[in-house]
From Swiss-Prot:
Gene giving rise to this polypeptide: zapC
Compartment(s) where it occurs, according to its Swiss-Prot or TrEMBL record: Cytoplasm
One GO BP: division septum assembly
Keyword Cytoplasm tagged: yes
Protein keywords: Cell cycle, Cell division, Cytoplasm, Septation
Pfam families: ZapC_C (PF07126), ZapC_N (PF21083)
Organism for this UniProt entry: Xenorhabdus bovienii (strain SS-2004) (Xenorhabdus nematophila subsp. bovienii)
Subunit structure, as described in the record: Interacts directly with FtsZ.
The name this protein goes by in its record: Cell division protein ZapC
Statement: the UniProt record of this protein carries the keyword Magnesium: no
Function comment: Contributes to the efficiency of the cell division process by stabilizing the polymeric form of the cell division protein FtsZ. Acts by promoting interactions between FtsZ protofilaments and suppressing the GTPase activity of FtsZ.
Example of a GO cellular component annotation carried by this entry: cytoplasm
Family to which the UniProt record says this protein belongs: Belongs to the ZapC family.
Domain of life of the organism encoding this protein: Bacteria
Amino acid sequence: MKIRPDDQWRWYFDSEHSRVMLDLANGMVFRSRFLAKMLTDYAITMEEMPFSVDDAALYYAFEEHFRCINIASELRAELALNGVVAFRFMKPQMPKSWYFSSFSVMTKPEQGEIVQVRLQDCGTEVLFMVAEVGDSASLCLLAQQKLELSDRVMNFCDPIKIMNDRLMPYVEPTRETIYGRVI
């Protein structure tokens, strides 16, 4: 299912679920991943407000970057919408970069870019989406189903702030044919 931003969409905070919600105006409601304790006071006290042109532009910018990874359209929409919520409504976070190896490959990623990091303890590479770019650290959302860290488990779209020197550009794996190396 592919969703398209619409001027009928409305943001609101649902106190029963303690989350920012987006009424998609077609009988569907999107519930963000982020609990009230992670959100700004503005998000928690907001009245219903429209999904703005800036929100739509950000949604499409995020979605454009996802073309390089193989995930279902429903998950793309979920990641993009959670990215918009993270950018607009999340409280600032402190970096938690000790989980990841330093590379100094990237000085500053692009908003929405799919990046990879390498786990310090086992060398596994993990995909994230950059929701908000900072000068030295960026807020990222997990762009795969699950990540087991030494002291916690992250799920799809969970946020973490990572120092930019830990981020690497994601390079899509290439498929070689059996004749790919023939000279």
